[in-house]
Structures are given as C-alpha cells and as structure tokens.
C-alpha cells in the first residue's frame, strides 16, 4: 500500500514539474495486444493526442474532455489530494487553447488565489493540505529523496491579477489602504472692520453696527439717552454714559479697590487709584461686575534668606494701606 501511495505522489509531482517546464508532454506508449482496455484505465494516464486542442481556434467540438479521476481507495487517502490537484492543473493546461507559453517555456499563473506556489521540503512529508488557506504546496515523497525540487511557476506576461486580492505571493496582503485624506480647514482670518463711517472725511470703522450707530451720533449731534433725575436735563449719545452719570445721583460705588476699602463709581477712577499700591496687579481689578482673585506674589529672596538664618521675616505689607 505504501508503494502505491508513493507512486501516486511521484506522479503528481511529475505532472507539476512537466507543467512548470512547459515542454514535456507525456504520451501513452502504444498499447500491447490485449491490453487496450486495461491501459486506458491506468491511474494518471494522459489524454490521447486527438483530445488536445490544435493550433487553430477552438470550437464547440474541440473542447477536451475532463480527465477521469478514479475514486481513491481508503488506504490511499493521503495521496488523493495530490492526484486531484494534478488533475485540475492538467485540465486547466489542456483547456487554455493557446500554445504560446509552451513554446516559450513559461507556465501560466496558478488560479488558486496566490501568484506563486509554495514549495515544500523534500524531506518533510506533506500528507495534509490546508483547504482553508488555499496554499498550493508541492510535496515530494519520502522514498524519492533524490527528486529535484519543483520550481515556482513564473507569472505569464499580461496575465490578470490573481483573484483574492493577493499580490507577490504574500499571505494576507490586501490592497494598499488609501492615504488618509483629512479635510483641510480654512485658515482663521481675523475679523475685519466692515462697518465704515459714511460721513466724508471720517475713516473710522467698527466691527459691530451698533458701535457705528453710536459713532454717527457724534456727527449728527443726536443724544437720545436723557437723564430722568429731578432737575437734571443732561443727555447722552450712549447708554453706558447715561448709566455712569446716573450713579452720581444715587451715590452707588460699585468699583471697590482690592487692596484697600475705598470704593469708586467709575472703573477708570478705580484703576487710577489702584496703581498707587506697590503690590497692584491688573488681574485684581473688578471685571464686568465680578472681582478676580488677587494674585499673591512670592516673598522676596532677602526675606527667604533671613528666615533661613533664624531672624524673623519683616512685617508683611498690609492690604489696608492706602497711599
């Protein structure tokens, strides 16, 4: 039984070698007398020359018949995949209908999903094929250690790409991913002063139309905001000017100094006063009705050295000091 398995393996390897070389064509020897029917049923017998396609264009009647593959015996289960692969490749070679690659010594690309077959070692037995991966491995029998290795079939010129998205025989190599196309953002341009003053000789421009309207009142002399306090007939061009004036009547002082208890009715007065403090910082000034947290400056280097030497630090500056 092992001899039969080795014979079938050697026949499959010989078929692959002949197809890769492209110039060797197996022909059945003349049938001896009385052995016509028995020789035709030999395992792996090549089809007769009449079944091979001619040099002319193939027609419906010139299609070669499919090779008859006998059912493998239970003991030869390891050789059946090799015989089946050899028969399928022989069928593809016979049904191509063109003999250009036979004359040039080139073999067509395998259509098993890979561009190059993967040869196996001569010493390593290959009794199992991987149907899931579809890798076409050529394995030599163990008994024939002097059998030459099967060369890989080169790709035929002009042949289409192998199905399955594989290129160059790389396993699992899909099509190259497209470059990441990040949409470009429009560069942020600073807002332009679109609202120009229409009066001749005035080149002022503003970002908002409300600011332009209040500016135009300086040209027209219009003062729509009037004080409604008793015995006060003052008018203003802007609403914030009226609110500032109204505090003079009520005595409200909403701007308080962060360094002393003094308060002021106008923010510019508070800023002018706060600058007199040596520890003043602009972040201490009240901003839009909310006082920011005053920033405490770190102690001076001389004070740190005096505290390290044992002498106590000098008196801390009082926030209630008013200049």
Swiss-Prot record:
Gene3D superfamilies referenced in this protein's UniProt entry, alphabetically: Classic Zinc Finger (3.30.160.60)
Subcellular location: Nucleus
Entry superkingdom: Eukaryota
Skewed-composition ranges (Basic residues): 184-195
Zn-finger (C2H2-type) residues: 195-224, 225-254, 255-282
SMART domains on file: ZnF_C2H2 (SM00355)
Keywords assigned by UniProt, alphabetized: DNA-binding, Metal-binding, Nucleus, Repeat, Transcription, Transcription regulation, Zinc, Zinc-finger
GO molecular function, one term: zinc ion binding
Protein name in the entry: Krueppel-like factor 14
């Amino acid at each position: 039984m092992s001899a039969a398995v080795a014979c079938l393996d050697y026949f499959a390897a010989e078929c692959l070698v002949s197809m890769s070389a492209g110039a060797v064509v197996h022909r059945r020897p003349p049938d001896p007398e009385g052995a016509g029917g028995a020789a035709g049923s030999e395992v792996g017998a090549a089809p007769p020359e009449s079944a091979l396609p001619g040099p002319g264009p193939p027609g419906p009647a010139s299609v070669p018949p499919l090779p008859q593959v006998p059912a493998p015996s239970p003991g030869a289960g390891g050789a059946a995949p090799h015989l089946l692969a050899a028969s399928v490749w022989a069928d593809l070679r016979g049904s191509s209908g063109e003999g250009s690659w036979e004359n040039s010594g080139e073999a067509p690309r395998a259509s098993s999903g890979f561009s190059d077959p993967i040869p196996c070692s001569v010493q390593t037995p290959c009794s199992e094929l991987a149907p899931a991966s579809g890798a076409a491995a050529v394995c030599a029998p163990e008994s024939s250690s002097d059998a030459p290795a099967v060369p890989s079939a080169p790709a035929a010129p002009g042949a289409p790409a192998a199905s399955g998205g594989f290129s160059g025989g790389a396993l699992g190599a899909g099509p190259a991913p497209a470059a990441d196309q990040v949409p470009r953002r429009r560069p942020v341009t600073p807002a332009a002063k679109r609202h120009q003053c229409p009066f001749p000789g005035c080149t002022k421009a503003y970002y908002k139309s409300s600011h332009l309207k209040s500016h135009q009142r300086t040209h027209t002399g219009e003062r729509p905001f009037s004080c409604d306090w008793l015995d006060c007939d003052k008018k203003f061009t802007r609403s914030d000017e009226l609110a500032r004036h109204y505090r003079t009547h009520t005595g409200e002082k909403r701007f308080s100094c962060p360094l002393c208890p003094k308060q002021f009715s106008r923010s510019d007065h508070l800023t002018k006063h706060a600058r007199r403090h040596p520890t003043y910082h602009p972040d201490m000034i009240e901003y839009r009705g909310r006082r920011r947290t005053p920033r405490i400056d770190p102690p001076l280097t001389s004070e740190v050295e005096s505290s390290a030497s044992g002498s106590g630090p000098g008196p801390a500056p009082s926030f209630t000091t008013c200049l």
